[in-house]
Amino acid sequence: MQLTPHEQERLLIHVAADVAEKRRARGLRLNHPEAVALITSHLLEGARDGRTVAELMVSGRTLLTRDDVMEGIPEMLHDVQVEATFPDGTKLVTVHDPIV
């Protein structure tokens, strides 16, 4: 399989998000990279599904709570940004304070 660097990066994000989701399902608290991967994957898939930037900015804040992540992670994670491909082109999606 021949993947471009961009495709490799997207695949890595989705694999990391899958690992994070499995750990969360087992009751483990997520670390920083796992939390970022889970939120980023949600944003990428939402864009692929045709959701709007505004919808994703709101839903990106509902995925994780303080109880889902290790201590100190909400304070470390101020923004999650990703360039996502929407039906009408690529757009930057920013989720401010994604863990509430």
From Swiss-Prot:
One of its GO terms (biological process) is urea catabolic process. GO terms for cellular component: cytoplasm. Pfam families: Urease_gamma. It catalyses: urea + 2 H2O + H(+) = hydrogencarbonate + 2 NH4(+). Its EC number is 3.5.1.5. The keyword Magnesium does not apply. This is Urease subunit gamma. It comes from Streptomyces griseus subsp. griseus (strain JCM 4626 / CBS 651.72 / NBRC 13350 / KCC S-0626 / ISP 5235).
